[in-house]
Curated annotation (Swiss-Prot):
Phylogenetic lineage: Bacteria, Pseudomonadati, Pseudomonadota, Gammaproteobacteria, Enterobacterales
Name of the molecule in the record: Aspartate carbamoyltransferase catalytic subunit
Gene that this polypeptide is encoded by: pyrB
A GO CC term attached to the entry: cytosol
Species name: Serratia marcescens
Residue positions binding L-aspartate: K85, R166, R228
Pathway: Pyrimidine metabolism; UMP biosynthesis via de novo pathway; (S)-dihydroorotate from bicarbonate: step 2/3
Similarity-based family: Belongs to the aspartate/ornithine carbamoyltransferase superfamily. ATCase family.
């Protein structure tokens, strides 16, 4: 059948149906098992990062090189015509689109406007905006499937900054496309999961609950998804309290299949001795970004009969 994602913008995880997600994940698994170094040969990809990034930018650029594509772009938007001369974002991206076959972009502006405001005919892949991080979600899903053998009938806890953490918003929306998943949200009141995410779960009849500590739910979990509590969002006294409340230690009493994930960077929320436990999987998770982002770049650039 024709590739449904060819030349499609991927701005939000909601741009992808369950079938689309399964297509990207199957492609990622194939690339991990059998690397294909020339699938995007002669393609040129723009890497446009208007915000700081380490893992996302480097894994995207590595992914492109491993598929045979050339990469152009920048890691500091302040040195572009947009930053120096006042050019609009729409004009900047419209011009770049005439040079390349696809654009990977991180920008604080929410992605729907980011894609719709430029006149170009190449796909835009959102590498993180003010609300969504779809490619992080793809590597998270790939990692969950790799460790659990499925994406349905899972018990998933999300811990830390659930209000501003774009990774947990996208991941919850994606996992809600698969049946039987159950969510546990663990966060201070000031950083609780946004109401629109909870409403979405309720409308779909998906079970969730809120909790004040990690320990009370660990025995139930397949996936424990940690995030950092962002110091800049809280009063100093409140931060000191919640920081100690949401620290994962190596003595967690989880099931044998439990995996601890984290979008990184971690600060203090996962003790370093957790790294040596069989539950820790966040560094492998980061490595899976190569395969998930390679797969996404491939399916939007190659009109394959998949």
């Amino acid at each position: 059948m024709a590739n449904p994602l060819y030349h499609k913008h991927i701005i939000s995880i909601n741009d992808l149906s369950r079938d689309d997600l399964e297509l990207v994940l199957a492609t990622a698994a194939g690339l991990k098992a059998n690397p294909q170094p020339e699938l995007l040969k002669h393609k040129v990809i723009a890497s446009c990062f208007f915000e700081a990034s380490t893992r996302t930018r480097l894994s995207f650029e590595t992914s492109m090189h491993r598929l045979g594509a050339s990469v152009v772009g920048f890691a500091d938007g302040s040195n572009t015509s947009l930053g120096k001369k006042g050019e609009t974002l729409a004009d900047t991206i419209s011009v770049i689109s005439t040079y390349v076959d696809a654009i990977v972009m991180r920008h604080p502006q929410e992605g729907a406007r980011m894609a719709s405001e430029f006149s170009g005919n190449v796909p835009v892949l959102n590498a993180g905006d003010g609300n969504q991080h779809p490619t992080q979600t793809l590597l998270d899903l790939f990692t969950i499937q790799e460790t659990q053998g499925r994406l349905s009938n899972l018990s998933i806890a999300m811990v830390g900054d659930l209000k501003y953490g774009r990774t947990v918003h996208s991941l919850t929306q994606a996992l809600a496309k698969f049946e039987g998943n159950r969510f546990y949200f663990i966060a201070p009141d000031a950083l609780a999961m946004p109401a629109y995410i909870l409403k979405m779960l309720e409308e779909k009849g998906i079970e969730y609950s809120s909790h004040g500590s990690i320990e009370e739910v660990v025995p139930e979990l397949d996936i424990l998804y940690m995030t950092r509590v962002q110091k800049e969002r809280l009063d100093p006294s409140e931060y000191a309290n919640v920081k100690a409340q949401f620290v994962l230690a190596a003595d967690l009493a989880g099931a044998a299949n439990l995996k601890v994930l984290h979008p990184l960077p971690r600060i203090d929320e996962i003790a370093t001795d957790v790294d040596k436990t069989p539950h820790a999987y966040y560094f492998q998770q980061a490595g899976n970004g190569i395969f998930a982002r390679s797969a996404l770049a491939l399916v939007v650039n190659a009109d394959l009969a998949l």
